[in-house]
Amino acid sequence: MRDKRQNSLAAASPFPKPASPLSLAAPTTTGLFALSLAIFDLDHTLITGDSDYEWGQFLIERHIVDGEDYERKNDRYYEQYREGTLDIFEFLAFALKPLADHDRRTLDAWHKEFMQERILPMIPEASRQLVDKHRQQGDTLLIITATNSFVTRPIAEFFGVHHLLATEPEIVDGEYTGKVSGTPCFQHGKVERLHQWLLEHNETLEGSWFYSDSHNDLPLLREVEHAVAVNPDEKLLAEATRKRWPIIKLY
């Protein structure tokens, strides 16, 4: 059952005023609240842009890929993602190819530059405060993202979040193959991957939170006890308003 804190944050009409992010998390007074799982989407939720798209733009800027063709495809796939029409396997064949074309040492060096130039400027202080609030409460922190783990693991580490569920690029003999390993962490795939993780870590969704900006995450938002829309897109805003989910702005 949704608690009174969430109901008090619900919309009145027709679009709710964003709630304060730090007012949402439950206190941890002994005997009143159990520790919970706090799940965060990454792109356009904890950061102000899309790390997958920005990695592509970084590759273009450095002339690592064919600029004109790659940018056209990168833009098209990004729009398909926003519209909810993305063929995830077609996209991954495109997005993971540069990983297969270069050795790990080179890729890791590029990623350090990518973090400094493109990712760190996209991390608002409010995002760090929200993650820290759940950390201080003793909650288990998890970032879940459709973007591949090569791009996102260093970002999760920057937030101090050790648990990451991301689309996994296949690795053979220490190098990327350009193929995907397992289920892509996208739409219903996020639910599948999360339930597998829950079994492996002896966790449950009791008292769980999930913060996301995207209608692509509606399957998972409907699974948790406390769904929170963060700077939501139009479709998620409509659903959050209808469901009376809290709506917050982090940037």
Each language-model region and where it sits:
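C-terminal cap/substrate-recognition subdomain and adjoining C-terminal extension
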Residues: 31-35, 109, 116-251
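Hydrophobic alpha-helical membrane context
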Residues: 16-19, 53-55
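Alpha-helical substrate-recognition element adjacent to the catalytic core
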Residues: 24, 29-37, 42-168, 177
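Intrinsic disorder/low-complexity segments enriched in small, polar and charged residues
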Residues: 2-3
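Ala/Thr-enriched low-complexity intrinsically disordered regions
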Residues: 10-12, 19, 25-30
